[in-house]
Amino acid sequence: NMITGAAQMXGAILVAYDSIXAA
C-alpha cells in the first residue's frame, strides 16, 4: 500500500505503523 511504499524509502516508523494497521 502507500505506507509500505513510503517505508521502502526509509520510513522504519511507517513500517511499524503499517504492521499495526494490518493487525
Swiss-Prot record:
Q: How is it modified after translation?
A: The N-terminus is blocked. The C-terminus may be subjected to proteolysis.
User: Superkingdom of this entry's organism?
Assistant: Bacteria
GO cellular component: a single term: cytoplasm
Task: Please state where this protein is localized.
Answer: Cytoplasm
Q: Name one GO molecular function term.
A: GTP binding
Q: Which UniProt keywords apply?
A: Cytoplasm, Elongation factor, GTP-binding, Nucleotide-binding, Protein biosynthesis
Please describe the quaternary structure of this protein. Answer: Monomer.
Q: Recite the other comments.
A: Different sizes are detectable in 2D-gels depending on concentration of the herbicide dichlorprop [(R)-2-(2,4-dichlorophenoxy)propionate].
Question: Record's family?
Answer: Belongs to the GTP-binding elongation factor family. EF-Tu/EF-1A subfamily.
Summarizing the function annotation, the protein's role is: This protein promotes the GTP-dependent binding of aminoacyl-tRNA to the A-site of ribosomes during protein biosynthesis.
Q: What is this protein called?
A: Elongation factor Tu
